[in-house]
């Protein structure tokens, strides 16, 4: 898609919508889009698709990071997202207010409340409800079936594609957290009404990890 294909003129104001790719912020105005609801123009960088795919001959980045450490990190991310001084969240709301049908005050509240998911007890509950033995996320767990046959089981990091809605910033937070807890390699398809929240969360995480 380019400027001509969506009927833009040079006078149109364009909102920047950067990507976050393998730990790096990617900015640019190579591709112009229109938001579905308000018809606002926003620009994204053009990226080499090979960079999006994590090489299969490399170990997934989170595979050997303990689950407890991942949850600690997610909890700190939640605290940073609730911080009124977080520049990435402020910038996200500023941009989203231009492309979204919801009022700015509602967007601000949704973004703040989304961070409530990053609660230690809640995150542990999510893991325990989905994994009979959460230790399998960190190590090989011995098993024995009814015949006495022994084996070892470990949850291997999956490759996940998340298709995110544009009317709920909380889904971005949940998707990032759940993908992290199963140590996945994640690709997020973002909505035209909110191509900003996911990037703001990831930038906050990268700032913690500096």
Locations of the language-model features?
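N-terminal Rossmann-like NAD(P)+-binding subdomain of aldehyde/semialdehyde dehydrogenases
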Residues: 1-152
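Secondary-structure boundary motif
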Residues: 83, 207-210
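Conserved small-residue-rich beta-alpha loop and adjacent elements
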Residues: 127-208
């Amino acid at each position: 898609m380019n400027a001509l294909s969506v009927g833009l003129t040079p006078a149109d104001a364009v909102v920047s919508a950067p990507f976050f790719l393998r730990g790096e912020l990617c900015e640019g105005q190579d591709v112009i889009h229109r938001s579905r609801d308000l018809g606002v123009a926003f620009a994204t960088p053009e990226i080499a698709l090979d960079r999006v795919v994590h090489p299969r001959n490399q170990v997934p980045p989170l595979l050997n990071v303990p689950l407890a450490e991942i949850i600690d990190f997610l909890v700190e991310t939640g605290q940073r997202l609730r911080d009124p001084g977080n520049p990435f969240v402020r910038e996200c709301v500023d941009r989203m207010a231009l492309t979204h049908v919801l009022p700015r005050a509602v967007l601000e509240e949704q973004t703040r409340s989304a961070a409530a998911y990053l609660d230690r007890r809640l995150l542990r509950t999510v893991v325990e409800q989905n994994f009979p033995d959460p230790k399998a996320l960190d190590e090989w767990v011995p098993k024995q079936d009814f015949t006495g046959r022994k084996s070892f089981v470990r949850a291997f990091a999956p490759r996940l594609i998340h298709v995110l809605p544009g009317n709920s910033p909380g889904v971005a937070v949940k998707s990032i957290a759940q993908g992290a807890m199963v140590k996945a390699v994640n690709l997020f398809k973002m909505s035209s009404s909110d191509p900003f929240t996911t990037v703001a969360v990831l930038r906050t995480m990268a700032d913690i990890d500096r």
